Amino acid sequence: SSAASDVYKRPVRESLDSVYAAHAAGKHLADDPLFKTIEPATLLYINYEALCAKTSHPAVGMAALLPCFWVYDGLGQVFVKAQKKSRLQKNPFADWIAGYGSPEYSAEVRQALGIADALAAETDETVKAEMTSAFLTACRMELHLMEAAWRGLTWEPVAKPH
């Protein structure tokens, strides 16, 4: 459906907008070490979402994307409340994170959930089971992504051959 297509395209548009904004501000992301390498947990997660979206029923692809929307909506809500009570306003990512706690973003999340429900209603039990599996796997990957960031997990250095 067109609405599902829009939900798939939104994160891509946001990412491109961020790159363009950084470039317009004179920041060159290619020079930033944070952007030189995609970390393992991120690579695993985005490839899993892409695999589900590309090779599975559209409902399964949508289910694989939902944890990202839903988790960030919840985290955004918590952050907005915490921001009012603490020094989190000084966090350099405060505005970006607070955007995930906005009523507009929550409305988009509800739209994504509605699309997933509508897609599920049109499928059989086999596809619904695949949706559940994709959703739970993506939830685990979301947790792993955050844990990896918290613990600073990255690629192991590759030794040069002697």
Region locations from a protein language model:
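Long amphipathic all-alpha helical oligomerization modules
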Residues: 102-136
